Every structure is written in C-alpha cells, then in structure tokens.
Amino acid sequence: MTKNQNFIETKEYKRFAEFCDACIKYQYIGICYGQPGVGKTLSSRYYTNWNTIEKQVNHRGWEDLASKTTDDILSVNKIFYTRPAEKQTRLSNDLYSISASIDLGQKLHIVNKYGHDHSKHYSDMFKYIDLIIVDEIDRLKVQHLEQLRAIYDEHNLAMIFIGMPGIEKKLSRYPQLYSRIGFAHEFDNLSKDETHHILEYKWQDLGFDLKLEDFTDYEAITTIIKITKGNFRLIHRLFAQIDRIMDINGLDKISTEVVETARDSLVIGIR
C-alpha cells in the first residue's frame, strides 16, 4: 500500500489503536512487537497522521515551514520517529528538533492564515505532545535508550517502542527503562477473514470485481492466502507484481497462474 492509498482499519489496527490510547491515558511506556510486514509501521504512521505531518516538519528554514503548514499541524499531539541507521547523533536531538518544528509550524500557521497571535503558548518542549512512537527500537544502543528514558521522565507523555519479537527481553536488561514499561502488545498477522476483506479492496484497486462464486477468483484468493499467510506487506508486494504482470500481458482476470508468476517475481519474503 502506498502512502496515497486509503488505509484499511483492520482488527489488528484497532487493537493497536486501543493499546496506544491506553498508553496515553496512563502515560506509560508500551512495547509493541511483531514479525516484519504485519503492519506495525504503517499503523503507527496512520495513528499519528504522520504521512501528513512529516511533510510539514521536514523543512529548510522557517519560510519553507510556513509555506507547508496546514490546519493539521494545529492538532498534532503525537510524534512518530524512526532512527536512521546511518546517523550517530543524539537521538534526543532529533526528537527535540521535530517537536520544535511542530511548535514553530503551529505559530506560523496561526499567524499567517488567521492573522492573529497564537492562542496557545507553544513554548515548553513536548508540552502538547501526548505520545512519542519510536519505530525499529531494535536499532538503538544503550545511550539512545537512556535518552528516551530521560525525555519520558522529564515530560508528561507516553512512549511506545516498536520492534521485533523478543524486544521485551532485550529491554529487560536495562532495569531503569524496563521498570517504566506498563503495557505490551503483539501485532499479529491478518486473520483469514480479514485477508479476504483486504483482497476485495485489492481486486477493486485493479479495476475488477471479486466474485467468489467464480472458481477462478476463488482459486486465486486461496492461493494468495496460502502464499502470504496474512502478512500485510507481502500482500501489497504481491499485488504490485500482479498488477505489473497483468498490464504487460493485457490480462483482465486474476488467475492462479498470474498469482504464482507474481510470487516467483518476488525477491524475498516467500518460503
């Protein structure tokens, strides 16, 4: 699924959103873990509206920031952050920079669009931030975890760490941080019924109607479910190949042969 496509709120997403809401309510640190491709990052970005906000806070100075802001910036109370693999700077600097950009963007937008001074004093760093989601927590070193703990202790907010299964064991080695974790959530694969639901949307995206009474459609769906095993990312990668194969060959029907050819075109992720 690309950033421009509609997000489908699955049961797993709704469970994740409830988990995030609980962390905010109690101002806890939470950990969310799951296999690659189940939808952790996509769900986090959707929950924080980060696809919209990220474009506004990534700027080249205040004039650039002022030209990008929309009313969405005014309601920002969550931050989504992924630690770049190549950067060695302080993680806390990145988070403070994002928060400062949100703060400045809110001020500039109110002044420029509404012609009056900002109604709230966005001065205390993270004052209006309720939640920071940190993706790929597995990448972080001890000093980065300590920086996150310091931010959590200094500000009234919640944090959620996103990672692979087993991340809770890694974090347990750092008792000062681990003692602050209040909730844990496993992000699971899609159920068979939800995969069916997603596939209906994917059929429509390609301009086709899914008809389960049509054996060709039924057989294709069964094959896709068997291949992807409910893995969200794998479904979308497979359909990108299906779309390409059908376009090249001028086909108007998704068959098992098309699905298997698409599977063989994928570099990784199929066993």
From Swiss-Prot:
Coiled-coil annotated residue ranges, if any:
none
Q: Does the keyword Transmembrane helix apply?
A: no
Keywords assigned by UniProt?
ATP-binding, Nucleotide-binding, Transposable element
- Entry superkingdom: Bacteria
Q: Mind telling me which Pfam families this protein's record contains?
A: AAA_22
Disulphides: none
Q: What is this protein called?
A: Potential ATP-binding protein
Q: Please name the source species.
A: Staphylococcus aureus
